[in-house]
């Protein structure tokens, strides 16, 4: 049985007979067989079954057109069977349904337990391949490929030998399980095929053995022997690729982007011994010390490079000051490896830096206070000018209490305000 030719039919009314269901599914094409699942204890139908067509295209048409079909009291559910449903169908039909393989499906030699040595030992490749189940011949020798195992058998030959020992319904079950996995968990299926390339070959080889695909398709997917895969030996491009292992050689020189305050571009030169053998590579500039009027770190200081992407780390531009009294002569007073020690004039004392910061803060506070006082005085002056500009007629119109207050304020003002207002 080809699982791709079978459709699952669910939500079947209990009073509907098999002949009625078959008549419905004949609308998509000729029906090869229909199996209605019956409860063995009660003898009543369970409400679902399996319809088999002669080709996958007709089965796909039934899924598209007959899903949610109105069957009287219910609407039919039509879909491709899952791996669990195919397993139930195999148990329902039994080995006698196929009739052309002698071994039982539950044979102990085909169970998937911890004993992986249940298969017979691999024979040399010079012996003919097994043909016990009438499978088609193996692809041409030019497309067998694969690396030879210690026994002298090619890897693809060994995959075919294992598949040739399986019964036809076991291969169908394997293909249906792979199909269900690809539909339900495509990411896990992709990871499975990437980590187990032999499984990918086994799937296509099984499809070829069951005549579900042509030989030319498998031949196009295989790589002939002697052809090197692209990217097998990539040249050293000077960066760490996530696909490379850490045991590979150290990459070539990396140009560091130019930084402000006199830092020039540099290349990887050495690994700092202060971090041990697992430290990140460091970039070193020419030995000439290029100072700055601001007292910044000289250009000869080394810049640590990130081992993951080859860019300078943040700590390279903001190095932490070392503890006083613990400075290493090899690294200078700044705690950074340098080929030349900068002069004392280019390094500020911590006490002077603290004093300068405090003075700057005090000056900023004084400027803020002065600005606020000036704004307040300007506002008062504007109000007084408006008050003195009032005429006697305007003052007489005001209420008595406001009139009295304005007169008191005008009398209390100095004579200079009165002169300016006039």
UniProtKB/Swiss-Prot annotation:
Entry keyword Nucleus: yes
A GO term for molecular function: mRNA binding
GO biological process: co-transcriptional mRNA 3'-end processing, cleavage and polyadenylation pathway; nuclear mRNA surveillance of meiosis-specific transcripts
Keywords associated with the record: Nucleus, RNA-binding
Chief location bin: nucleus
rRNA processing keyword on record: no
Compartment list: Nucleus
Entries under SMART domains matching the protein: RRM
Domain RRM: 5-83
GO CC terms: Mei2 nuclear dot complex; mRNA cleavage and polyadenylation specificity factor complex; mRNA cleavage stimulating factor complex; nucleus
InterPro entries, per database record: CSTF2_hinge, CSTF_C, CSTF_C_sf, Nucleotide-bd_a/b_plait_sf, RBD_domain_sf, RRM_dom
Disordered: region residues: 337-358
UniProt-recorded name of the protein: Uncharacterized RNA-binding protein C644.16
Species lineage: Eukaryota, Fungi, Dikarya, Ascomycota, Taphrinomycotina
